[in-house]
Design a protein with these regions (language model features):
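Bacterial N-terminal signal peptides
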Residues: 12-22
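Bacterial N-terminal signal peptides that target proteins for export
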Residues: 2-14
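Acidic, serine/threonine-rich low-complexity disordered tracts
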Residues: 30-38, 42-90, 95-112, 162-248
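Contiguous hydrophobic, core-forming segments of folded domains
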Residues: 78-156
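Sec/Tat signal peptide C-region and signal peptidase I cleavage site
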Residues: 24-29
């Protein structure tokens, strides 16, 4: 498959995976209890204009995220895409379904024991492709990468350690190796930042990196900068900066 086409969907599916942005544990959640948190993300394009907004609804059980539903709306407030994730089978390889209603683009996963069923189509005129891949060690997909960063934040924020993960991209039918390293944030000691990029030097030539910042204490995602999981109106990759609003 030609590299430019591959990186188009790699960027859209992979570099948009952190748009879950939940807290490690809401301040009001208690052990052995089911709680819900609703919050919003605002995505701005490279000109600083609002590209879309995200409405998140996260369900927790015993302090761990169980399910998340994200609804994307354009600047007119019209719903344009939906992402649903279920973390009960695997925290880093959730069963998820994504649909961009503008173009009919779909992709998703379903964890079945030691295997992951994946599917996807690039637009409403394309056939749905289905595959089955083995669930590998250090594999993540979709919003599971955010869960991985949150759970390993202490280790990743120390020194110059570089951690590798295998990111599964349903639209590509395979996984790719990504590397994670800490970013220096001396002016903001209360935050921790990470850079995430492809491990392959060839892929790094055409696939952009992403940067994220977390609150050290709450482990909430504060900002995201990189390629969006929503394509632009011309079905091309768009770079965005997203800031998150949480309930007080």
């Amino acid at each position: 498959m030609p590299l430019p086409k591959m990186t188009k969907y790699l960027n859209a599916a992979t570099f948009g995976m952190l748009l879950l942005a939940d807290a490690a544990l809401p301040a009001w959640a208690t052990t052995n209890n089911r709680q819900e948190e609703v919050f919003q993300g605002v995505a701005r394009d490279e000109r600083g204009e609002i590209a879309y907004t995200e409405e998140h609804r996260m369900i927790y059980q015993d302090g761990r995220p169980q399910r998340n539903e994200t609804r994307y709306r354009d600047v007119q407030g019209q719903e344009i895409a939906v992402l649903k994730s279920n973390f009960t089978t695997h925290p880093y390889v959730p069963s998820y379904s994504f649909e961009d209603r503008r173009f009919g683009r779909q992709d998703g996963t379903f964890v079945d024991g030691a295997w992951v069923k994946i599917y996807g189509r690039t637009d409403q005129n394309a056939p749905v492709q289905q595959e089955r891949v083995r669930l590998e060690e250090n594999m993540v997909t979709g919003q599971g990468l955010h869960m991985y960063l949150r759970d390993h934040m202490d280790q990743l924020s120390k020194g110059d350690e570089i951690r590798q993960v295998r990111f599964l991209v349903p639209l590509e039918g395979r996984d790719f190796v990504f590397r994670i390293r800490r970013l220096d944030t001396p002016s903001e000691p209360q935050t921790v930042g990470f850079n995430i990029e492809a491990d392959s030097w060839l892929l790094r030539l055409v696939a952009p990196k992403l940067e994220v910042r977390y609150d050290r204490e709450t482990r909430r995602l504060l900002s995201y900068r990189g390629a969006s999981n929503l394509l632009n109106a011309d079905q091309g990759v768009q770079n965005v900066t997203i800031t998150y609003r949480y309930p007080s």
